[in-house]
Amino acid sequence: MALPSAAMQSNPEKLNLFHRLSSLPTTSLEYGNNRFPFFSSSAKSHFKKPTQACLSSTTHQEVRPLAYFPPTVWGNRFASLTFNPSEFESYDERVIVLKKKVKDILISSTSDSVETVILIDLLCRLGVSYHFENDIEELLSKIFNSQPDLVDEKECDLYTAAIVFRVFRQHGFKMSSDVFSKFKDSDGKFKESLRGDAKGMLSLFEASHLSVHGEDILEEAFAFTKDYLQSSAVELFPNLKRHITNALEQPFHSGVPRLEARKFIDLYEADIECRNETLLEFAKLDYNRVQLLHQQELCQFSKWWKDLNLASDIPYARDRMAEIFFWAVAMYFEPDYAHTRMIIAKVVLLISLIDDTIDAYATMEETHILAEAVARWDMSCLEKLPDYMKVIYKLLLNTFSEFEKELTAEGKSYSVKYGREAFQELVRGYYLEAVWRDEGKIPSFDDYLYNGSMTTGLPLVSTASFMGVQEITGLNEFQWLETNPKLSYASGAFIRLVNDLTSHVTEQQRGHVASCIDCYMNQHGVSKDEAVKILQKMATDCWKEINEECMRQSQVSVGHLMRIVNLARLTDVSYKYGDGYTDSQQLKQFVKGLFVDPISI
């Protein structure tokens, strides 16, 4: 019996996930002699929806793709955290007073547009810009529209020009990269004299990460500055050296905002000559204040899981409560999004459980039964599931029932349907990967990446997060996500590429589906080294697509788009040196900085 599409059941005219790519504009990218239809409709023509025979097939032998996942490094530590209301109130009172002072500083800067933009950048880097979100949007819009030639008018040096360029682009304003033309010589190369300006070179390096397709000047800027920064960092003053080392390790634009704020506060404090004491105190107090809220929420989430007492029923699954909550905070760290974070955390936990079940334990026959049950979304399916899957299936349906009750009280019960359908589509993608694995099939690269961009969980997590956002009060954002927009696909493709590039060896040792590397090698007849280089270039180009989509007119606000971008940022951080989710040692320092260690006041 064919696995039904829940989305198609509810609306026969609605495009199935596997057919949505046809709605995207065609943008082909060149990679040597290989033309990759990255965002084109041609991928659709190669992608075959699983046939009834395929969906009905089962293995003749019960083969479990058993895997060993290391235990959590945290134990039950976070389930026993205590929250001190008086400590939070003390921070809160001081933050309220300082917030007024900082707003006065922001307003007083408006007489000089460049000074305003630099201050906005400082607030963003310190992690406190969310307090003044509306003011910042209004100020930047006014400056951008009234002073389109701001950099030339003010005769900005390289350091300042790059900050202005980066700030506008990061807020969705497409400032022209031509602002950097004046820093080139008569031969069209960046002036050698710029090498004497370390701060300016660092600023240009950070700005170059906001490039879009076709901006050769930013490609040149990246190569020029990276070469200089890598070779000269050892010769600089200690604090500037730390700035450069951090930027080379993790550029600000592709970093997780909350982690970047933690790092920058320390660097700003060390800059004794230039720091503003009011801004510094405000940032430190606010960081610790918000950290207390995150600790309380992580405790609630950990206790919720512990009280379910399900771990013994699914011992093969990864125990990653702290890392899961790291996902939630990476997307939405601001205090007002507590409910959103809890929804994200529970959904990511469910994704992790089902992913581990299909990927590392279930037989093909069991995977088929689970996929059908998720597609039908009905408790009556329990009787067909093996006992260990019943636990997961009940948790899935019960959790979404809880979401519906909570969101009904907020007038958003309609949003749960979109989350449910996104979950069903995710499991369809998992099932297809299991079929490929079971048949020993290496799919075409285009087919693999298209399906793989969805099985990253990004479309589902994005949808689930929007369910909990109070300012999203209608269907607009959910209907936009349903179209598999280019931002979502580019972010998902980036996550899939980075994930595979760092974890494919370990996963294949336990019989995982072919990775993007295998698919590309098989389709194009290139060596592994060649494939890796090409895929790394594709991952870089994903960021250009992401940047472009955040700077074009959209039915969704830039603020909401950035939450999807944050998932790509999270992957950039978590998979930089391996699978940081599976090996929780790799994320330990980040979890400590977010949830354990406060900033010294």
From Swiss-Prot:
Pfam families: Terpene_synth, Terpene_synth_C. The keyword Transcription regulation does not apply. It is found in: Plastid, Chloroplast. Its EC number is 4.2.3.8. GO terms for molecular function: casbene synthase activity; magnesium ion binding. Induction: By oligogalacturonide fragments released by fungal infection. Detected after 5 hours of incubation with the pectic fragments and reaches a maximum after 10-12 hours. Catalyzes the cyclization of geranylgeranyl diphosphate to casbene, a diterpene phytoalexin with antibacterial and antifungal activity. Belongs to the terpene synthase family. This is Casbene synthase, chloroplastic. It comes from Ricinus communis (Castor bean).
